[in-house]
Amino acid sequence: MTVHDVLHYLDLHVAPLSLKESWDNVGLLLGRGKKSVTKVLVALDATGAVCAEAKALGCDLVVTHHPVIFHPTGHVTDDPMTETVLDFLESGIAVISMHTNLDLALDGVNDVLAETLGLDHIMTLESDEDEALCHLIRTGFVKPCELPDFAAFVKDRLGCPGLRYASGGKPVREVAVGGGACAGYIEFVAESGADTFVTADLKYHDFQLAEKLGLNLIDAGHFETENPVIASLAARLGEQFPELEVRIAHHGDCIRYL
């Protein structure tokens, strides 16, 4: 079993690399493809703490959602911006990152988020006018309830230490979800007929816009809306490669709440 074998499976059966956005960086980002693999650690982020955990566990490979290398760099040193890359290289641990391709993929970030929130009749929100808006957002239905009650449910299901929400003046029935930073989809979601949008990384004026559009808006946190896919990804790797020991990283959200 090699790193390339794992990447081949992920590309063909989990999140095709061809789905990635043009600006993204995915696939095998660090290490040798021919490297033998016996232990894999799956994590949302490729941080120094994750590298240390992988090293302590004796892992040969780390599979992450967020890319270990995202912005172009002209050096890899112990500078804070590249030290994590150096940590992985010095530890001999390969890194595969599945980012926007996993956001868009069937049973990826957003399908798992929708399922975690108990949505029924989950569908991909499509646009006849703008291809760039297609394939990411998922919609589904919940039992009708008031927004504060649904927000409390989201907080509990995702393990949020806190969340923010704004009312569009409607009860919750048809819910759209976009894991991570999806503020750019607010108008698209409102036009779709959904009454509620669960996403993350929202600004003050995003909430104002949603209120004007009559859309309930919930910011449940970047980590919290994307991390559910990690357990799913680990389970799929374990089922496909029973000879591998697949572990889930213990790292959590770096954001703290008072």
Regions found by a protein language model. Give the residues of each.
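Hydrophobic structural segments
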Residues: 1-258
